Swiss-Prot record:
This is 5'-3' exonuclease. Keywords: DNA-binding, Exonuclease, Hydrolase, Nuclease. One of its GO terms (molecular function) is 5'-flap endonuclease activity. Its EC number is 3.1.11.-. It is an enzyme of class 3 (hydrolase). It comes from the Bacteria. Signal peptide: none annotated. The keyword Cytoplasm does not apply. The gene is ypcP. CDD domains: H3TH_53EXO, PIN_53EXO. Residues 175-262 form the 5'-3' exonuclease domain.
Amino acid sequence: MNNNKLLLVDGMALLFRAFFATAVHRNFMINDSGVPTNGVNGFLKHLITAVETFQPTHVVCCWDMGSKTYRNDLFQDYKANRSAPPVELIPQFDLAKEAAAELGIMNIGFAGYEADDCIGTLADLFANEADITVVTGDRDLLQLLTDKVSVALLQKGIGNYKVYTKETFYEETGVMPKALIDIKALMGDSSDNYPGVKGIGEKTAYKLIREYETIDRLLENLSLLPKGQQGKIQQGLSDLEMSRKLAEIHCSVPLACTLKDALFTLQMEQAADMLRRHQIKGIERMLEKLNAREIV
């Protein structure tokens, strides 16, 4: 038995959440170099608090690498409804990665894939080597829940999480975590802009998958459904198949990473230097507290 505890952080979710929490008041915390730091400031607060809360031995922060992925090849309009990031956020992507690295945290991203796919790949890769906690604001990652993987969903404020295990997810929804893929395939996702089956909403999608467990079994028993539902699914088969592929997190991204690479040791001096260099305020005391805990 090992005592490894791996924290997989959805860097995109933390940074976006942190940015918009203060951007609504136009509080961009611009430093002397003219670079906004509000998103990075909040990102670091979320990140350090997660490390304090879950006390991992290993940490990886995962990122999107550009706006286009293999999902755009499957469906041209995937996420096409999303507007471009605000100009004040754009320079903070690289700054957030730099900040995480200076703390001693490994960053991972892979062109053509989303942060979710990197998280799923690492969760699969290290399932036999560590207990894994995923920190995110994205419910799509609940499909990754297993006996070895829990998911901490960010709630309002910093340090507030709703932690799911495979068991608590089933208790809440009546389906197994992997079934979330088929549910999303049926109902679609307006945020990611894929259609699902026209006329099938969330309530019906959950009901159908609770009863039939998978889309494959649902299709085998299509004749048992009410005529209206049969017609909707038959007419939407191609969208259903495509949406299923879009909903599933890809867990075999070719990442070159060992668990040893992700070992976390707080780099206090270089982290403090980075904060001073970029004039990121209010973080150093959090680091000192974290460092004191590590020394003990």
